[in-house]
Amino acid sequence: MGLAFPPSHQNDAVQNLRRWLKESRVHAWIGVLIACFALQTILEVLGWLGHVNLEGALLSYVALPAWANWQIGQIWTLLTYGFLHYGFMHLLLNCVMLYFAGHMLKTFWTDLQVVRLFLVGIITGGIAFVLISLWSPGWNPLMGASAGVLALLLAATRMSPRMPVYLLGIFKVPLWVVSAILLFISVAGLSGENGGGQVAHLGGALAGWVLGRSPEYLTGFSWRTSRFGSRAPLRVVREKTLELDAILEKISKVG
């Protein structure tokens, strides 16, 4: 016996989802991560049915390998690895952490600054992974948005270390305790099987801590604005100066 939902309920669900995704860039990026994981899953299933490793082909192009297998020409993998995940629980944990860390930081920053730090954290974590893998060439390819999530968490911690957080919805602790626990786990896991992932976590955390007091560096400006934008204010000042000179000249003539 199947269940069928009225079309009106289906439309409401779709509209609510669209509204939620548009409410915040953080929500939108959660949607991106879920969509990418859905693509991974579809390719895995299709590959299994056709006896072709389609997901492996995707990962070879998008995941971030260790230095020994990484080519500088694939520079985009320093970012794109953050859109992929090893499994559903990996995705779920990062999405939940992104939601809460992102909204905590939005207390102090703009929506755009939060998302840009998330992406910077992913890139910084990727760079740390590639560099340290010089001494650990056997690391598995890196995937996951954890470095970006930790960047947000550390930035929020630097802005407000005593912000109350409820662990498991019960235990009230300051935010710095949560960050300290996660950093300890990453440091303790450096020599473990996921040492490369822990290095990326610490790289993202470092980016969040450094930029935590300098969100202005995450404020957008285009190359066009940075190169030519200063001319407009000068022109306005010059025009106002000429107008003022003309007025003063008229006043002097009148007496």
Predicted regions and their residues:
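Short, Lys/Glu-rich amphipathic helical modules
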Residues: 254-255
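A detector for small-residue-rich transmembrane helices and their helix-helix packing motifs
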Residues: 2-251
